[in-house]
Amino acid sequence: KYTGGIIINPKTGSVYALGVLPSFDPNDYGNAENPDVYRNPLIENVYEMGSIIKPITMGIGLDAGVVTPQTTYDDKGFLTLDGYTIRNYDGRGRGVVPMQEVLNQSLNTGVAYIASQVGTRKFGDYLKEFGLGTETGIDLPNETVGLTDNLDSPRAIEYATASYGQGIALTPIATVRALSALANGGVLVTPHVAKEIEYESGASKKVSFPEDGQVISKEASETLTRMLVGVVDTALM
């Protein structure tokens, strides 16, 4: 079992901190009791990320023009697709609620509704544009690609579950990169730890990493940011 964290500048992709416990002392490399600590699970392992994917889904819905913060849907607490039933975390329905409440209360049925309004194929394409299922390009070894084959499925249930981070498995660094785009005007950046290369001769060279494109509009990004501030101000305080 691991615990870890990543702190990144969403506008540049510069990684300020990336750490995992348990770890090892690089000055005493051969003395680790468990060789598993030599792996970096933030780069090399994949996980079903769950509800932290919901802001991405909301951003997609805003960008596609199928919802606004005031758009309402009838939350019955469950939704059945392809013979499978998905439920809110507590199984309860909220009745007619706006999209702001989908984020405030982390409603699975709400983000599944957004995915259905966007359309399964288009929604899957959006998630791929966020870099989910591809390498981020981080300048660290052994990066693993996420498991996102479900985004090519003809079944609507796969996209509904993906909308709240289940059924697809992602590396933490790929997830952080995708979330960073939401705070960067919709622009995806390459995460990186290097800034400059210094040579023995005394010369140095700045290292640059490219932006990877606009995944949602700046307007959608700004609207989503206001919605997430609303979550903190009204639902968490």
What is the meaning of each model-derived region?
Residues 3-51, 56-237:
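Beta-lactam-recognizing serine transpeptidase/beta-lactamase-like catalytic domain environment
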